[in-house]
């Protein structure tokens, strides 16, 4: 799992050109500057929108919130072509706080999440709703919807890995969830990362919180493992493919684990490329999430929900 998370994260995040920069109203965000993550032509107008309570959208506090949406096929590349989601087995619409990156010290963060009633857990497609990334390196904390629900995953260094469920599947939809984080960015053992959900402490880690110089926040929808989803939805057709084309020992093992919705990234791509001509057409359901009260500050009282 650790290797998979490193593979699915990319190293060239953040583009500071004027076209990429977005200005979020104080009603929904404070403390960080955000820009579109990947600024190629793929970034759709519906990718992120500032929406209003008056128009029937859910809002945690105030009059506005941020709505993110990813539809089937919403992959693209950055302006210089250095990174491509389409080639990398992923889709996204995210905002990046790379221009407000932090090098050290203690910070407080907050955001509130709302998953609509029609929301679906699409595992083994991995949907990331928020993360802390490093410049030119891997993420350190990711907030991913795993099979059992919304979870925090720690990936610091080559061997460190941990995951903790924050919100159960049966408690996610149709309500706001308030996330509060207290973090100290450090390469040493004096670092820490604490997560409260709806005023309850759910995660309390002490130790190094980074390996690179700078850490920054990202919000939105980031889907990884498109081929895993396609393979799972065509699992019977993989059997037909293997009967005709044969199978390696690794492919046979991967198929067995896929029945349990588990499969490693590289072998998933390999099986997809080998067997896709046997597949039925599959459209990934649209992913929608609302963010509100996205705040960063050195002081706890400056983040969270302000009624």
Predicted regions and their residues:
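Sec-dependent N-terminal signal peptides
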Residues: 3-14
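Low-complexity, Ser/Thr/Pro/Gly-rich disordered linker/stalk regions
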Residues: 19-178, 183-307
């Amino acid at each position: 799992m650790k290797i998979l998370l490193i593979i699915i994260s990319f190293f060239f995040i953040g583009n500071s050109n004027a076209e990429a920069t977005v200005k979020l109203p104080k009603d929904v965000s404070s403390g960080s500057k955000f820009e579109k993550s990947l600024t190629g032509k793929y970034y759709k107008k519906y990718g992120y929108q500032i929406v209003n309570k008056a128009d029937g959208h859910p809002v945690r506090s105030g009059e506005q919130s941020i709505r993110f949406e990813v539809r089937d096929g919403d992959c693209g590349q950055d302006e210089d072509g250095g990174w491509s989601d389409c080639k990398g087995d992923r889709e996204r619409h995210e905002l990046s706080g790379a221009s407000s990156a932090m090098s050290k010290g203690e910070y407080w963060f907050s955001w509130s999440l709302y998953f609509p009633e029609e929301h679906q857990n699409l595992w083994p497609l991995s949907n990331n709703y928020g993360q802390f990334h490093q410049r030119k390196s891997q993420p350190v904390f990711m907030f991913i919807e795993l099979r059992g629900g919304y979870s925090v995953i720690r990936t610091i260094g080559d061997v460190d890995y941990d995951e903790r469920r924050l919100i159960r599947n049966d408690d996610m939809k149709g309500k706001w969830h308030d996330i509060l984080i207290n973090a100290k960015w450090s390469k040493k053992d004096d670092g820490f990362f604490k997560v409260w959900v709806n005023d309850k402490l759910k995660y309390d880690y002490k130790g190094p919180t980074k390996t690179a110089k700078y850490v920054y926040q990202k919000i939105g929808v980031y889907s990884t493992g498109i081929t895993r989803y396609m393979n799972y939805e065509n699992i019977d057709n993989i059997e037909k493919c293997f009967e005709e084309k044969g199978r390696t020992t690794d492919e046979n093992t991967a198929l067995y684990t896929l029945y349990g919705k588990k499969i490693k990234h590289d072998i998933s791509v390999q099986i997809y490329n080998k067997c896709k001509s046997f597949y039925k057409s599959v459209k990934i359901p649209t992913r929608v999430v609302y963010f509100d009260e996205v705040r960063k500050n050195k002081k706890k009282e400056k983040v969270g929900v302000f009624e």
